[in-house]
């Protein structure tokens, strides 16, 4: 298996399963989503040992049905109409009068991931801090939209972040023309912080707590 920050099998001598040469083969691997290197994020490749060096002989493949491992198995909500509109909380009454049942919310990681934040979240053995007041603003907006039966799509944005530079791809430089940047999963540190942020959002806004509401996409 190869994690997102691994680019090749060079130097690797470990493997998840082994089989003798045959016309076809299949592997069954144990799954533990609580392990440090979550297998859902890995890509898998078949390799052969040639002179002590493992060489790939297949394409790389990902797990194609990760949803079956989710703790949250509620059905996707059905909207009463197809009508959608990008709205702010102050526009909610107008949106309801128009029959709006879909909207998108920009979720800026830079705004709520705060090393001095009062809201803590433990993930994979590490504690992350979030800006409590900013998160509560998201809570209010998402809750009020959800309570009106509006299906929410979250647009997760990665702005320039000097407090968490690991979220930025190595070598990228801040520009005056770019507001947002690609999330970095090419390093272990960036990958871990990205995992933590996405896990926090998924746990908070999965709809199980009415105080937070639900982001469906």
What are these regions (language model features)?
Residues 21, 36-40, 77-79, 146, ...:
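Solvent-exposed loop and beta-edge segments used for protein-protein assembly and interaction
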Residues 4, 30, 39, 56, ...:
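Proline-rich intrinsically disordered, low-complexity coils
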Residues 34-37, 71-78, 119-123:
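Short linear motifs in intrinsically disordered
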Residues 1-71:
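Beta-strand-enriched, solvent-exposed domains that form extended recognition/catalytic surfaces
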Residues 98-217:
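Substrate-binding cleft and catalytic face of glycoside hydrolase catalytic domains
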Residues 27, 85, 150:
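Extra-cytoplasmic beta-strand recognition segments
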Residues 35, 73, 80, 179-182, ...:
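Residue-identity detector for glutamine
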Residues 30, 41, 54-109:
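Boundary/entry segment of secreted carbohydrate-active catalytic domains
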